[in-house]
Design a protein with these regions (language model features):
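Surface-exposed binding/hinge segments that line
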Residues: 65, 223-265, 281-284
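N-terminal lobe/hinge region of extracytoplasmic solute-binding protein
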Residues: 131-180, 588
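Ligand-site clamp/hinge motif
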Residues: 297-337, 344
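Append "and occasionally in soluble cytosolic enzymes with long acidic Gly/Pro-rich linkers
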Residues: 361-441, 445
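Periplasmic binding protein-like
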Residues: 447-492
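Long beta-strand-rich cores associated with HINT superfamily self-processing modules
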Residues: 555-590
Length: 590
């Protein structure tokens, strides 16, 4: 299938449904990301293949025209039927994302649905095929700060120990035992034998040492967790000793995170190949798909699923007809699929940029924005899956905040706001776009000139765009299972907004407060300290918590063994299928 051809047809269809359509060569060059010379050459090639008739405009001001031999709907259905027969998923997803009428797909919607979700191949391999609604960012543990990517790392790797969310304690994993000195400065770990990496070598203490050393790099997301390490010694092949410069009872909790995935010391890290010890290993990764295969040599129970496929599909309303195991978009009516909702998954918030000069530096302006956004009204009037209104990082601590819109004009006057433009950053996620537009409209009612800057997840976490080009940002935070660790990471992680947008004066005071939190041994007192830190952040309007959203996943009723992963998704390594899956498919895919 020629994707450029259908990109052009969809673009022109939205201008005219006629078979003969006027156009500008510059427009086609733009959508094809090429020069006008190459766009003209491409049209001539299509004409040579009898796909269209190209009628260039002769003379200045005369518009060029294209004549197509058949309607776009007919061509789309022909290609779809061929792609379905060939299991050409990439082509099908491409067509589903085009800005063309959803009704065109109605006659073959069942066939399209059955290509996703549960499958069994000709040689009886069980496959789970799913969709993600954006391109993946980095899978390097040194940088990963996004929940979906952290979840994927937990499926292809293992940490030294794990955190049991139900029991609220650390449990053995690669390390079967450990001991710690009374002052929490000396840690000794005893490793399992016969833990194999994906390339066949047995893991030993030198690999753990290598991983910790790698994670101690200054630009690592985990640097703040490991900066107290004084020495790492391999006592023998399966025993490791770590000495800290100062006491840190949280040290072992740091080792549970996806960022502490144990890597082999003898392989240069490549996030597109990813060698570790996890229950799955990467078979293929590119912009279109990520394919995981079960690792037969896994040191615990081998996954029952043989393969998991994540296909990237960023746009397209027709995609709502497909089972979406890994997205918050609802899956439309199919009785075989059951929607699972989880309340209060993380928190959505605004974070103000205190590096940039301008009106957002004024506390009165930030307070005006606080009173402007009444999330209780949003949850009732505007948005699905909005969840509960937030006033704290934790859902269980949040109570409906008091908003006083009658104060806004006086606060704007106090801040000497003169209608100047304020850059409001948000991501490309559909719900974020809708919510940010709602906030922009609320602001306009009070004369606040908010200009939205829409950025990618990659830019939000791994670039200087938030700090250099926005006055405040709206983001969502999905924490790990360990509540206290999640809060520490939210405020310490160099790739998350607080560390990106707070100036050094705020960071210094915040660090002192977090250090006091970490050194407090009593959990109930730490809870009081967390409330105090959150109150300090919100009363100064450095942060404005918005809401704790719902998370929904559409799962086939035959999927069993569902267990929550620390990052809000279900653990693929524990999934199994109760009866015969939907249909037989080929052993491979395109």
């Amino acid at each position: 299938m020629d994707k450029d051809y259908f990109t052009m047809r969809a673009y022109l269809y939205n201008k005219s449904t006629d078979l003969e359509i006027p156009f500008k060569l510059n427009d086609l060059a733009t959508i094809w990301f090429c020069t006008t010379k190459n766009a003209k050459r491409k049209l001539q090639q299509y004409q040579a293949n009898n796909m269209l008739t190209y009628l260039p405009g002769l003379g200045r001001g005369n518009v060029s025209r294209i004549v197509f031999p058949k309607q776009l709907e007919m061509e789309v259905l022909e290609v779809l039927e061929h792609s379905l027969a060939m299991d050409a998923f990439s082509d099908i997803l491409f067509l589903l994302q085009l800005p063309i009428p959803k009704s065109w797909f109605s006659t073959i919607s069942t066939e399209i649905q059955q290509m996703f979700g549960l499958q069994v191949t000709e040689n009886q391999q069980e496959v789970l095929r799913s969709i993600v609604r954006r391109k993946l960012t980095t899978l390097d543990p040194l940088q990963t700060s996004v929940s979906m990517e952290a979840f994927l790392i937990t499926q292809i790797s293992d940490s030294l120990v794990k955190y049991d969310e139900k029991k609220k304690k650390i449990i053995p994993h690669i390390a079967h035992h450990w001991k710690v000195s009374n002052d929490f400065t000396e840690w000794t770990f005893y490793l399992r034998k016969n833990v194999l990496f994906h390339h066949g070598r047995m893991l030993d203490s030198e690999d753990v040492k290598y991983t910790l050393k790698r994670s101690m790099q200054a630009k690592s997301v985990s640097f703040w967790q490991l900066e107290a390490i004084k020495s790492i010694d391999c006592i023998n092949k399966f025993t490791l000793h770590v000495r800290l410069k100062k006491p840190d009872s949280f040290f072992i909790r740091y080792l549970c995170t996806a960022n502490m995935a144990i890597l082999p010391r003898d392989v240069i890290f490549d996030e597109y190949k990813w060698i570790s010890t996890g229950p799955f290993r990467i078979r293929e990764r590119n912009d279109e798909r990520l394919v995981l295969e079960a690792f037969d040599g896994y040191f615990l129970a081998r996954p029952i699923l043989d393969r998991v496929e994540f296909w990237t599909a960023e746009t397209g309303t027709t995609l709502k007809n497909i089972p979406m195991q890994f997205t918050s978009v609802d899956y439309e009516e199919n009785p075989a699929y059951v929607e699972r909702r989880k309340l209060g998954v993380g928190v959505n918030f605004l974070c103000f940029n205190t590096h940039r000069k301008g009106i957002p530096q004024h506390p009165a302006f930030r307070e005006a924005i606080y009173h402007l956004i009444d999330c209780q009204k949003a949850s009732v009037q505007h948005f699905e899956n909005y969840g509960t209104v937030a006033s704290n990082y934790y859902p269980e601590k949040s109570t409906p905040p008091k908003k006083h819109p009658e104060k806004i004009n006086a606060l704007l006057k106090e801040a000497n706001y003169q209608g100047e433009k304020v850059i409001f950053g948000t991501t490309q996620h559909p719900t974020a776009l809708k919510e940010s537009q709602w906030i922009q409209e609320l602001a306009a009612d009070f004369g606040i000139n908010l200009e939205r800057k829409i950025i990618t997840h990659q830019e939000a976490s791994y670039s200087k765009v938030p700090a250099e080009e926005t006055d405040f940002m709206m983001m969502g935070e999905i924490p790990a299972a360990d509540d206290e660790m999640a809060y520490l990471d939210f405020l310490n992680n160099p790739y998350l907004l607080p560390q990106q947008l707070f100036n050094q004066t705020i960071i210094k005071e915040l660090t002192e407060k977090l250090d006091a939190f970490k050194t407090e041994k009593d959990a109930s007192k730490r809870d009081v300290l967390q409330t105090s830190i959150d109150r300090w952040l919100t009363e100064n309007y450095y942060l404005i918590y918005l809401h704790h959203p719902e998370k929904s996943q559409s799962l086939h009723s035959m999927i069993k063994g569902i267990a929550e992963n620390p990052y809000g998704y279900f653990d693929l390594s524990k999934v199994w299928i109760e009866t015969n899956p939907l249909k037989n498919v080929k052993s491979d895919y395109k």
